[in-house]
Amino acid sequence: VSNGEEVFLGMNRLRLVFAVLAAVVVSCNPADDEAPSVFSLSFDFSQVDNGWTGDFADYPQGDSVTYELVFRHDTLPPNLNSNGTLKALMLSGNNMSDDLFMFVKKKITGLKPNTVYNILFNIRLVSNAPTGAIGIGGAPGESVILKAGVILSEPVKILDGDLYYRMNVDKGNQLAEGEDMMNLGHIGVAPNTTQYTAVFRNNNSGSPFRFTSGNTGEAWVIVGTDSGFEGRTTLYYTKIDILFNEVGPI
């Protein structure tokens, strides 16, 4: 099975899981007493940013211009946007340290307090990174790892003692997963391509992300890329779907 077929089959399987689990949802407010054990959140960025914000970490203080760091709700590339009206969350950076983290985040509410959830992510993004290519520090596709997580506190960058911006969450490092974020694959599209192409990445029901809510039922979603490729990476997030499957109280 080719990589493209694996992505297609994986997306079909995840869509089936989302459809079956969503069928049991009987309330739109997961915090109600009659709340369902399964619910999903869906964010489409084709017209609005839906309150998501972006930032960067793992770079030296004062080097945001040198690293060409840009986040904005921007128009999709022309080959995927024939009428010129479709937008996405765009992140771009020139990784000069062999370790640049680019991320988007959003606060969510309405979770059941002190409850364990199994979470599935379905991330749709646009990338022009080829697979099988050689780059400085790592490959432009396979060495840029997509990660996602749900955490209690707002994910922010902080300045460490070496005057580098680091994350206040455990995201792991490049291929290594962290306590707060799991790997969803790389951003590579296909061999020898430089054309922006839609990419779908997800985890499945066999490897959910485990999260325990706090007293308030509030949390933060974070999605980002951990790069070992020393060069420019530009990505467009078009849609983020998150499914929460309640396991039970702690």
Located regions from the model:
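Short beta-strands within extracellular/lumenal beta-sheet-rich domains
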Residues: 96-111, 201-208, 237
